[in-house]
Amino acid sequence: KTSIIFSIKHEPGSLHRIIENFHNYNVNLTKIESRPTKTNTWEYNFYVDFEGHAKNSRIAEMLEKINHETLFMKILGSYPSAKLN
């Protein structure tokens, strides 16, 4: 499982272009949450959790594409999924 944060331009289709990467790489999103930035009106930070580890070559390639399509992107963590009993 990996968690990232990113910010995108406030324009039509910008979030779709990011989410489309997950579809194209067949990666399952487990959580997406938006929070307004403190700096610009109508600009949001998106927190995303998804299945897969950042060191996996396919995931790393997807994250590189996302990084180029965002104002900024940061990997918050990449860790094994836990199973609850």
Predicted regions located by residue number:
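A conserved regulatory-domain signal marking ACT and ACT-like small-molecule sensing domains
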Residues: 1-85
